[in-house]
């Protein structure tokens, strides 16, 4: 195996600052935990891409994504199919833009 390390952040539209976690940029919060069509298309493309090579990959998941059964099922399948080279990391609970807020080490 070639030792190339790639990390991928796994953010849906509801996680971007326009919709969540930023004190001035969040204007239209998305209240649903349903996956967006764009995210589902990205999941399918990611899986196709993983099938095209043997390099190790780390996927950083926002923990609240696990509230979607569809996402959980997809992640479980990825881990079954690519267990030898896929690592899952946590990219936070809900993708708050910490650097945009006043310091709060207790909450952080």
Regions found by a protein language model. Give the residues of each.
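Catalytic alpha-helical scaffold of carbohydrate-active enzymes acting on polysaccharides/glycoconjugates
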Residues: 1-108
């Amino acid at each position: 195996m070639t030792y190339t390390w790639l990390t991928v952040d796994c953010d849906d539209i509801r996680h971007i600052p326009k919709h969540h976690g930023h004190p001035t940029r969040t204007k239209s919060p998305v209240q649903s935990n349903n996956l967006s069509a764009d995210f589902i298309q990205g999941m399918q493309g990611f899986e196709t891409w993983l099938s095209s090579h043997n390099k190790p990959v780390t996927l950083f998941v926002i923990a609240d994504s696990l509230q979607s059964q569809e996402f959980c099922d997809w992640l479980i399948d990825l881990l079954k199919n690519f267990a030898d080279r896929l690592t899952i990391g946590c990219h936070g609970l809900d993708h708050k833009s910490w650097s945009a807020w006043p310091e709060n080490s207790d909450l952080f």
